[in-house]
């Protein structure tokens, strides 16, 4: 899980979702997991 100021899709499998007022990226590749902090 990477915590970044700006999250974006890295590949075509990445999905932007909102969870508990946070923008997150979930993907089939675990390296692409991100959270806005």
UniProtKB/Swiss-Prot annotation:
InterPro entries in UniProt: Ribosomal_bL36, Ribosomal_bL36_sp
GO cellular component: chloroplast; ribonucleoprotein complex; ribosome
SUPFAM superfamilies, per database record: Ribosomal protein L36
Pfam name, any one: Ribosomal_L36
TM segment ranges: none
Origin: domain of life: Eukaryota
Major subcellular site: plastid
Keywords: Chloroplast, Plastid, Ribonucleoprotein, Ribosomal protein
One GO-annotated biological process of the protein: translation
Compartments where found: Plastid, Chloroplast
Keyword Kinase: no
PANTHER family xref list: 50S RIBOSOMAL PROTEIN L36, CHLOROPLASTIC (PTHR42888), LARGE RIBOSOMAL SUBUNIT PROTEIN BL36C (PTHR42888:SF1)
Family recorded in the similarity comment: Belongs to the bacterial ribosomal protein bL36 family.
Protein name as catalogued: Large ribosomal subunit protein bL36c
Source organism of this protein record: Marchantia polymorpha (Common liverwort)
């Amino acid at each position: 899980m990477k915590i970044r100021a700006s999250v974006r899709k890295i590949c075509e499998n990445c999905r932007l979702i909102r969870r508990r007022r946070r923008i997150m990226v979930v993907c089939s590749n675990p390296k692409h997991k991100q959270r806005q902090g």
